[in-house]
Amino acid sequence: RSRGLGDVYKRQYYFNVMESRGGCVINYKHDAFPFGIGVPDIERGQFAEAKPFLWQSDTSVMRGSWCYSVQPDKAVYKAPQEIVQDLLDVVSKNGRLLLNFGPKPDGTLADKDVEILHKLADWMRVNDECIHGTGLWRINQEGPTKIQEGQFADGASRNFTSEDFRFTCRGGNIYAACMACPADGKLHIRSLREADASHLPLWHGIVRKVEVLGNPAQAAWTRDGEALHVDLGTYRSDMPVVVKIITD
C-alpha cells in the first residue's frame, strides 16, 4: 500500500511532473490514497452503474495474461467487438479505459495485437465523437445485459444484444451506442420514447435529426410512445453501432 502524498519521493515526483508537463493524474487501487486525491482504478473490472466521479478501468487484450504469451491457456484474446463494448460501457459511466498490449521480448507486438489495434482504430475513426469530450447523460444504459461489478470480473464474455444501449452526450447531441448490431437492422431505443409531461418521461426533448455514424445514407427514423425507432437500411456491422440524436 502507498503511504500517500506524505511520502517525500512521491510528493517530489508529483510536483516535478506538474511543472515539466503541465499536469499530473494519480491513479490508485485498493483505497491506497484518500478519496478525492486521485482517480480510483478497477483492475480488470468495472462499476455496474454510473458514478459522479471520474474513475478508470484497466484491462488487457488477453484474458489470462498482462504480458505476451504463447501458452494456450494464457494467449486467449478478446474480440475487438468486446473491447469496444467495454469502452462504451466504461465511458457511459464516467470512466476511462486503460487497455494493455503486452509486447514480445524484442519489443514488437504480435500479429494478433496489431490486427486488434487496427480494428479498434477503424471503429474510433468513425465513432470517436461519442467518446471524446462527452459526458454523462440522464441514464447511462438500457437493455437486459448487466455488468458484474468489481475487480477481475471481465474474464467471461458478455452476451450483449441489440436491445443493449450505452449513452453519452455532448452539447445538444445524445449518443446511443447499440452494443450488438441487429440482424434486421431495426433499432428501438426505449429511453428516447415520446411522451407528454403527464407521463413523467425520462427525456422530454425534441429530436431534430438522427444519424448513424459510419453510414453515409440518411437514417430513417420515427418516434412514438414505445421508442425511438431507427432503421439502418442495408448498413450492418460486426461492431457496436452508434446513433447520434441531434436535439432542440
Predicted regions and their residues:
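Mature catalytic domains of secreted/periplasmic carbohydrate-active enzymes
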Residues: R3-D248
